[in-house]
């Protein structure tokens, strides 16, 4: 059994890195500890230029770099020194003049950064596929019993600290080996993703000839948290986040206080935050079971997020109990005080949490308080996944947005300026409501939300019931539908409720009947030409 605590001293290290962040200081520290450095190409030159003693691999092997650098480290004196088992292969190594290499610091050619360039063609991509690097990484990781592998510059300081304490323990070497295999796995996945999108029937194999979806889909996620249970107590669960961080999200958020996030907390917080990101002016979104139950937008000079919270809560105070609250502005102390005094809340998330707000929420120790950072106004493209038994559905993220100039007025009466503001607001909310989705809104406040019904007209009825239960007036409100109305009954019911304007995608075989129903009731209706199903 391997001794977990015995420290491995380092006498010889091979350093060959593409990302040279921190490598000069790392090598200097190694030399100060009496470590002999082997190096290649650009790394060797960088170390030499900084006065660090190193042996070029070509001099060590007696074999020059060749084929424009394609063959540098693929040599028995290198791989024998890395793979050699110190307790079994010592005699063979000595017979062939192979010296043990105790530490390998390698990271790989920037393949991903190369292939995202618009001018990158297939030959350029191929030349940026690293061969020697992954081979050394895998060799060192396989022989982690005797060799330390470092693929991340962020580990340099910890490695030096351990060496100063006498060497690296087996537990440290095992962890570094795991990181190495994760690194090469992600690297090979990038290559497979890229090559899998190439149209082999075309003569010019550049980025313009690439398809959207590769033959195999490779994406790496890192475990951020093991959870007490999943969606239900009998299910086990963990939260994994993308290895490469993107825009501000629930995955990048920092938890400032409160109980550990549950599986459902993460899912609901994601729904709330992604919805509130849709609005440029101060907004509040309250979510329950992944559905917005209250949303409001209030300009800064009219009360900002403090007023927006009041209005969002007023939409459905009953459902807001135990909900998730998201803001698109810094959470201030006054708004935080209003929340904790008024309701039980599971999670509050905002781009920034003020010191005053933190102090207020601290009195409620179980409330999970998350700070996610700012996000760009323009949403980044990406992928959405839905697991099915035996498969995975992959689609581009629904980042489609509409502006007033995108709307097609299809009724005799055009919507007023205020109705247009409310229609676009309601449309943004409907995008995040489970289909079939109906949203009633007035003055950029939801007054009723109907979610998840098999019949669109029943979702409209539920929205009306919600408004009545909250004591909010539907008359004079607008209505948004995430998909087209298949029959005129949805508009007829809206007219009876007092709806004055409707926004929907259009595209039904019976659009003319639906438009006629709106005209009969003097309802203004606009088509977006864009559907927002959410399942």
Swiss-Prot record:
List the SMART domains hit by this protein, alphabetically: AICARFT_IMPCHas, MGS
Which keywords fit this entry according to its UniProt record? Hydrolase, Multifunctional enzyme, Purine biosynthesis, Transferase
Biological processes, Gene Ontology terms = 'de novo' IMP biosynthetic process
Q: Name one GO cellular component term.
A: cytosol
The pathway that the record names for this protein is: Purine metabolism; IMP biosynthesis via de novo pathway; 5-formamido-1-(5-phospho-D-ribosyl)imidazole-4-carboxamide from 5-amino-1-(5-phospho-D-ribosyl)imidazole-4-carboxamide (10-formyl THF route): step 1/1; Purine metabolism; IMP biosynthesis via de novo pathway; IMP from 5-formamido-1-(5-phospho-D-ribosyl)imidazole-4-carboxamide: step 1/1
Q: Which PROSITE patterns match?
A: MGS (PS51855)
MGS-like domain: from which residue to which, for each copy? 6-151
Enumerate the CDD domains for this protein: IMPCH (cd01421)
InterPro entries the record matches: AICAR_Tfase_dup_dom_sf, Cytidine_deaminase-like, MGS-like_dom, MGS-like_dom_sf, PurH-like
Parts of the chain that traverse the membrane? none
Q: What is its EC number?
A: 2.1.2.3, 3.5.4.10
> Which molecular function terms from Gene Ontology are attached?
IMP cyclohydrolase activity; phosphoribosylaminoimidazolecarboxamide formyltransferase activity
Asked whether the UniProt record includes GTP-binding among its keywords, one would answer no
What reaction does this enzyme carry out catalytically? Answer: (6R)-10-formyltetrahydrofolate + 5-amino-1-(5-phospho-beta-D-ribosyl)imidazole-4-carboxamide = 5-formamido-1-(5-phospho-D-ribosyl)imidazole-4-carboxamide + (6S)-5,6,7,8-tetrahydrofolate; IMP + H2O = 5-formamido-1-(5-phospho-D-ribosyl)imidazole-4-carboxamide
Name the family.
Belongs to the PurH family.
Q: Which NCBIfam families match?
A: PRK00881.1 (NF002049), purH (TIGR00355)
The domain section of the record reads: The IMP cyclohydrolase activity resides in the N-terminal region.
The protein's name is Bifunctional purine biosynthesis protein PurH
Q: Which organism is it from?
A: Pseudomonas aeruginosa (strain UCBPP-PA14)
Taxonomic lineage: Bacteria, Pseudomonadati, Pseudomonadota, Gammaproteobacteria, Pseudomonadales
């Amino acid at each position: 059994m391997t001794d977990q605590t015995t420290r491995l001293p380092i006498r010889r290290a091979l350093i060959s890195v593409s990302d040279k962040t921190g490598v000069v200081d790392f090598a200097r520290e190694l030399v100060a500890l009496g470590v002999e450095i082997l190096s290649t190409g650009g790394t060797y030159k960088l170390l030499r230029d900084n006065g660090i003693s190193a042996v070029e691999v070509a001099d060590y092997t007696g074999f020059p770099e060749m084929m424009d650098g394609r063959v540098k480290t693929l040599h028995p004196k290198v791989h024998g020194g890395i793979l050699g088992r110190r307790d079994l292969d010592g005699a063979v190594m000595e017979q062939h003049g192979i010296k043990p290499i105790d530490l390998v610091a390698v990271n790989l050619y920037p393949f991903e950064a190369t292939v995202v360039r618009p001018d990158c063609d297939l030959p350029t991509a191929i030349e940026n596929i690293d061969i020697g690097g992954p081979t050394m990484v895998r060799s060192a990781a396989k022989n982690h019993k005797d060799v330390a592998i470092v693929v991340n510059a962020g580990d340099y300081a910890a490695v030096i600290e351990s060496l100063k304490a006498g060497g690296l323990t087996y537990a440290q070497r095992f962890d570094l080996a795991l990181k190495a295999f994760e690194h090469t796995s992600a690297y090979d996945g990038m290559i497979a993703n890229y090559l899998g999108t190439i149209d082999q029937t075309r003569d010019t194999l550049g980025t313009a000839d690439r398809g959207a979806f590769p033959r195999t889909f490779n994406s790496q996620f890192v475990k951020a948290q093991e959870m007490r249970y999943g969606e239900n107590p009998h299910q086990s669960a963990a939260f994994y986040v993308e290895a490469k961080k993107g825009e501000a999200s629930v995955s990048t958020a920092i938890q400032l206080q409160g109980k550990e996030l549950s599986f459902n907390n993460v899912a609901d917080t994601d729904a709330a935050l992604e919805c509130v990101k849709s609005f440029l002016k101060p907004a509040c979104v309250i979510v329950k079971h992944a559905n917005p139950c209250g949303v409001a937008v209030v300009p800064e000079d009219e009360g900002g997020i403090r007023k927006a919270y009041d209005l969002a809560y007023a939409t459905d105070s009953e459902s807001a109990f135990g909900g998730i609250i998201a803001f698109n502005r810094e959470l201030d102390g006054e708004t935080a005080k209003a929340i904790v005094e008024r309701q039980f809340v599971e999670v509050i998330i905002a781009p920034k949490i003020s010191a005053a707000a933190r102090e207020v929420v601290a009195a409620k120790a179980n409330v999970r308080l998350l700070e996610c950072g700012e996000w760009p106004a323009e949403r980044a493209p990406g992928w959405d996944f839905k697991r099915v038994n035996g498969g995975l559905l992959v689609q581009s993220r629904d980042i489609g947005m509409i502006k007033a100039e995108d709307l097609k007025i299809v009724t005799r009466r055009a919507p007023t300026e205020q109705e247009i503001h409310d229609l676009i607001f309601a449309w943004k909310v409907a995008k995040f409501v489970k289909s079939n989705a109906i949203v009633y809104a007035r003055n950029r406040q939801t007054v009723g939300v109907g979610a998840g019904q098999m019949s669109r007209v029943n979702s409209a009825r539920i929205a009306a019931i919600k408004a009545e239960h909250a004591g909010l007036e539907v008359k004079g409100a607008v209505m948004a539908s995430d998909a087209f109305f298949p029959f005129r009954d949805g508009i007829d019911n809206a007219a009876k409720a007092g709806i004055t304007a409707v926004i929907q995608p259009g595209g039904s075989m019976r659009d003319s009947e639906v438009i006629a129903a709106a005209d009969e009731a003097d309802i203004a209706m606009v088509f977006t030409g864009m559907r927002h199903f959410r399942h």
